[in-house]
Amino acid sequence: MTAALHLPAKEYEYRRKIKTREELRGIIGGFPRAKKVIMCHGAFDLVHPGHVRHLLYAKSKADLLVASLTCDAWIQKSEFRPFVPQDLRAMNLAALEVVDFVVIDENATPIDNIRYLQPDYFAKGYEYRDGHIPPKTQEEIDTLSAYGGEMLFTPGDVVFSSSKFIERCRPNLRNEKLATLMDSEGLTYDALRQALDRFRGLRVHVIGDTIIDSYVFCAPISSGSSKTPTLSVRFERQTDYAGGAAVVAKHLRAAGAEVIFSTVLGNDDMKEFILKDMAKCGIECRPVIDPTRVTTQKTAFIANSYRLLKYDRVDNRPIVGKVLDELQETFATSQADGFVFSDFRHGIFNRATIPSLTERLPKGALRVADSQVASRWGNILEFQGFDLITPNEREARFALADQDSVIRPMALELYKRAGCKLLILKLGERGTLTYRWASDDVRAFFTLDSFAEDVVDPVGAGDALLAYATLSLVAGRGPVVASILGSVVAGIACEHDGNWQVTPGEIGERIDALEKLTRFE
């Protein structure tokens, strides 16, 4: 049993209408035929009243109505398209009584399928009939005329734009998209639970920049008659958290993995804090101590839930010479199953050190990289040929120097140029987009909506995703499980303040809830 929406069997009978073009050709036969066939083609991302009227009119002109839809790979009309994955779009059309058959067109235009299926009629919307025939429409007319088919234009008294609907108010199809993806991949919710069980005991080595995230909670003091705009607050308490690459290590450990952490620290109080924190979590820390630098600490001053000021204590000089050599020695002979480069650009990673650090990674182990663009300029493209990279949209656009392309073509370009095996592009509240191979195959990429319910603090959610996606791949569970579990964990992390370590128990509860929702329980 797969993860499809668990409706009664009779409610799912309409799925029999969805055919490959070869199956459809065998059913409708060649041209000419006794029963007339009319074909409509489009994205059908959101089926609205304009679509319904178009389909109803088309069906009135023939015996059989074939709804052809553009596959995901060729929809590049706007930022959020396609909003509904192709399998779910096909199911939506098949559920309409007026539609006899549905076919997913894997080509950029319907020309090839018109030539192959040879419908008696091909229906176009009224907006195309304005006295000027676009070149693409003329090509369709010529293809139809070559065997005796005809073009029909449907009445256009009701016209809607799916793109405008989606951009203004996107409906929540998170659960439906998840269930459709799992169904197409033959995945069950039990498979997700089993993946979590496999994480215990896996060995992962994290190499990266340590950051101490400090929160100083204050109470505002009235400025009284002060003649200067001086901000005055009273100290109440301070809370310190391990951040940066250290929190990635803690996420991995919370999932049950055996974790080694290599980093560079200053010889100061914050060094002692991070070493104690790692030991408390059961993480083996292999620090390189550089007495000439400070341990990175980023402090936020908070009063009445407002962040008044951020103060950074940091040394961004690139590591060189002895420090670089010592850091490489901490992982060169490591027996870990996977290695994570967590780059915050605070000295360890740069254009000069990355090739050297990458070369020292043990052969055959899984290689993962994440490079952040925040106060510093990391470039994910400097990590070439890795098994997994997890940039966010800003980091991807920075690496490509591309501010303008819509998401999916931009993601594909990044995937190709990075030479990686798997790209999980983080899109914030819009979820994730995953590329698993660079081709025109419709399964080359897939999307997931955000799983966050009540967002409290999204900072650090990407680190949680990175950790669980890494463990999924180390456990041999594949890109779909890696993306789903990573996205679920990121959603949970958003619901907590600070660097919260999500546990497998919390993830299991969220998976249970998702399964109930898709079963309509």
Residue ranges and their predicted role:
Residues 287-293, 300-334:
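Conserved phosphate-binding/catalytic loop of the ribokinase/pfkB sugar-kinase fold
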Residues 336-350:
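Short acidic, glycine-rich surface-loop motifs adjacent to enzyme active sites
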Residues 202, 230-296, 510-513:
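Substrate-binding N-lobe of the ribokinase-like
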Residues 1-184:
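Nucleotidyltransferase catalytic core that binds NTPs
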Residues 179-260, 449-456, 519-521:
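Glycine-rich phosphate/adenosyl-contacting loop at the front of the ribokinase-like
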Residues 39-51, 207, 233-242, 347-348:
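Short, glycine-rich nucleotide/cofactor-binding loops
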Residues 418-422, 451-515:
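Conserved post-catalytic alpha-helical subdomain immediately downstream of the catalytic base
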Residues 193, 338, 351-445:
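Conserved phosphate/ATP/ADP-binding segment of small-molecule kinases
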